[in-house]
């Protein structure tokens, strides 16, 4: 019987070397309101690239499932150079959903600017990339709803990536 209430998930496999679907977990990148994000790679060796694997928290509910499904659908519709890409999505053997996203090696935009003591012109060039990503999302009728420095990463070459559409609205 299916329940709409909270469902506990076994998190004993959520450690480096553990498997979630076809992905092997390498290290935890962060923890947020919906769950955790892990650096991962395909365990079967296909698609030799690292991904940011987004997983729900230990107690799973229908509402959280719907939010993850909405994020999946939103990301699938957004292909833009300044928005982290969705590569794969699915569920593992215990029914835990996952999103395999572009792994962006970068720093939050505020840290990037501060550590480099960027001039105003350079900061505005970064902000323009953010604005282009947001405008593109808006053109697809998507509102991010969680724009903050930790959701805007800047790579070593100065490219911006907008992350985390977890509470976005269509």
Q: Where are these predicted regions, by residue range?
A:
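Conserved ATP-binding/catalytic core of the eukaryotic-like protein kinase fold
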Residues: 5-170
């Amino acid at each position: 019987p299916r329940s709409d209430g909270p469902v506990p998930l076994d998190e004993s496999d959520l450690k480096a070397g553990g498997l979630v679907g076809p992905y092997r977990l390498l290290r935890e990148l962060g923890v947020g309101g919906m769950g955790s994000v892990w650096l991962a790679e395909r365990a079967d060796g296909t698609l030799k690239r690292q991904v940011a694997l987004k997983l729900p928290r230990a107690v799973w509910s229908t509402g959280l499932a719907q939010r993850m499904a909405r994020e999946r659908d939103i990301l699938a519709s957004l292909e833009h150079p300044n928005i982290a890409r969705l590569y794969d999505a699915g569920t593992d053997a215990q029914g835990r959903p996952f999103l395999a996203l572009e792994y962006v090696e970068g720093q939050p935009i505020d840290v990037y600017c501060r550590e480099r003591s960027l001039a105003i012109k350079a900061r505005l060039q970064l902000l323009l990339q953010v604005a282009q990503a947001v405008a593109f999302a808006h053109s697809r009728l998507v509102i991010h709803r969680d724009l903050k420095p930790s959701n805007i990463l800047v790579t070593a070459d100065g490219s911006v990536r907008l992350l985390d559409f977890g509470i976005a609205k269509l």
